[in-house]
A protein has these predicted regions:
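Short conserved micro-motifs at the rims of enzyme active sites and ligand-binding pockets
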Residues: 16, 135-137
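Conserved mixed alpha/beta catalytic, RNA-binding, or beta-rich assembly cores of soluble enzyme
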Residues: 1-61, 65
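Short terminal or interdomain "cap/linker" segment that borders an active site or interface and mediates
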Residues: 56-135
Length: 137
């Protein structure tokens, strides 16, 4: 299993906060752009891992983050501790388990010796059958 964390840093939060004070519509666009940037960064990093582990005959499983499905947000703190995130990249978690800076990601990526596709996605893989957000697949 690979644990990883990434952040755009405090500058992204500061810029969004500053813009929201005078032009909310532009702040919303900046918020979306920053979210896309951190996801693109993680995707690129995952592709690099795919190449590196592929040389060893290993295949990556999909990236999965605390807060997805039944993977509790309470896992954020152990992630950050294990990866020494505060010291290395300035990433912390609030008392309400939200990452700070806000444009940040923690996730796990599984490794397998078999190249199998995931046939289940989203709500299909989650065991929370009574979830108010559950969608039929």
């Amino acid at each position: 299993v690979i644990l990883f964390a990434a952040t755009l840093g405090t500058q992204a939060d500061q810029l969004i906060r500053r813009i929201s004070g005078w032009k909310m519509s532009q702040a919303v666009v900046m918020q979306a752009a920053a979210a896309a940037m951190i996801e693109a960064y993680c995707d690129g990093w995952q592709e690099e891992l795919k190449r590196e582990f592929g040389k060893q005959g290993l295949y990556l499983r999909p990236r999965f983050s605390p807060g997805y499905g039944d993977f509790p947000l309470s896992c954020q703190l152990p992630f950050l501790r294990a990866l020494q995130c505060q010291k290395r990249i300035g990433l912390t978690v609030t008392d309400s388990l939200i990452l700070a800076p806000s444009k940040s990601v923690t996730a796990v990526i599984g490794l397998s010796r078999r190249d199998e596709k995931c046939h289940k996605h989203g709500c299909e893989v989650c065991e929370k059958t009574e979830c108010p957000f559950r969608r039929d697949s």
